[in-house]
Amino acid sequence: MSKMNFDQFIDKAFPVRNPFSRNEFGGVTNAIKYFAVRVSFIFYRLGITANQISLFSALLAIPAFVIIYQATIEEANIIKFIVGYLLMGTVLFIDFVDGPLSKTSKYKYFVGDDLDNLPPDIATMGTLLIFGLLSNNIYFTALFWTNAVFLFTYLRNTLIHIPKEKEWILRLICSRFSLLSVRVFVATLFPLVCIMYIYNQELATTIVKILILFYLINSALWIRITLETKIKK
């Protein structure tokens, strides 16, 4: 079977065609999607599948975290941090690439969605772990790491139990532009705090501790809200 040309590919993989027409997304997100669709087409022509690049992306996150950790906490090296974060940026960019590419496959894999979510989940968890270390306090680190486990377990499993009148907490910590989203936390807040840590460790640790307390308070509120949903036995 012959390969599709770009027009045929985009009709199948991204029917919207022009990402900038999506007003619900920001200009940066749409610009990234514009380039991601074209990179998807290149991978398609090369015979590389969405599952393959998702696995590559997950593996790429490992050296990215090692370099970011060393550059920020051990060496205070801004150049090395930029290199590490460029690797992390590649992991995040691939998450935009594999979606259109997956639509060209003849098969739908039962674990396809889980595999697609793996790299951004690794990116989020890894940045949360490093963020906790930036407090320079074992108690704050332990609290934040425990909270990270909460975010990936209890929070995800109880989304349906948030009542409509309390949906403000969804927007605060569980929406596309929430304080824990990839766009806000991983792509913006985390690198800014790391750079601050490299140049002014005392100020950075203070800000990290304040943010950790903020996230913990929101997690406690989440638990309280979900416990309000109950039925009689």
Spans of model-derived segments:
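Membrane interfacial helix-start motif at the N-side
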Residues: 37-51
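Membrane-embedded alpha-helical segments that form the functional core of polytopic membrane enzymes
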Residues: 50-111, 143, 202-216
